[in-house]
Amino acid sequence: RLESVKILPSEGTDNSPELYGAITADASSMAEIANPQAKRVFCMAVTADKYVTKDGAPSSWSAELDSIIAGVIDGIKKLYVVSAGNVQFDELKNTQYPSANINHTIEDPGQSWNAITVGAYSNRIQLDDKVFKGWNPIADVGELCPFSSTSIAWDNKWPIKPEILMDGGNAITDGTNIDICDDVSILTTNRDVIGRPFTTTNA
């Protein structure tokens, strides 16, 4: 059974960073109150790229997430899977791979000790689109996805993140320029379920 709790506000507004932890706790509680007997895995693919702790130190959000997972308030331990956060396309163009991935550290709250943080590797290298004739994938099979953040730059006293990797697609280059295309991207669902139920993405 799939459950969903919205934690992002309406378009054009933002939650206060000081409330990220409380909002996450409320979202967890809403799901558990609605169906207390269910055994669930929480998946949170939302990060705060504006509030990255470059050294891996805890934030109020990651600390609250650790508390939620440990069951400090309700005595119920939880399994949380969170995203590591994405290297932006402009970073790849300006800094290049893999330096951009080293410089872009895991985004808040991915530094949570108790959460399983998910990064990405690349598994797609076949390029058939004739528009990109002469281009090549940036990452080889099994290598770090060009869009995945890392914890390489963190202080040694903080955990090594991410714990697991999943296929996050790839990017392509002609030796000078960088781009993306469907051939090396991940198929996913689209919000336009009638007109275009599927789309592609990179993570």
Regions found by a protein language model. Name each.
Residues R1-L2, A115:
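Extended, compositionally biased low-complexity polar/Lys-Gly-rich tracts
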Residues L2-E3, L79:
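Nucleic acid-processing catalytic cores of prokaryotic defense/repair systems
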Residues L8-N114, S122-I125, F198-A203:
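Substrate-binding/access-modulating region of protease and related hydrolase catalytic domains
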Residues H104-A203:
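Extracellular S/T/G-rich loop segment that most often corresponds to the catalytic His/Ser-adjacent loop
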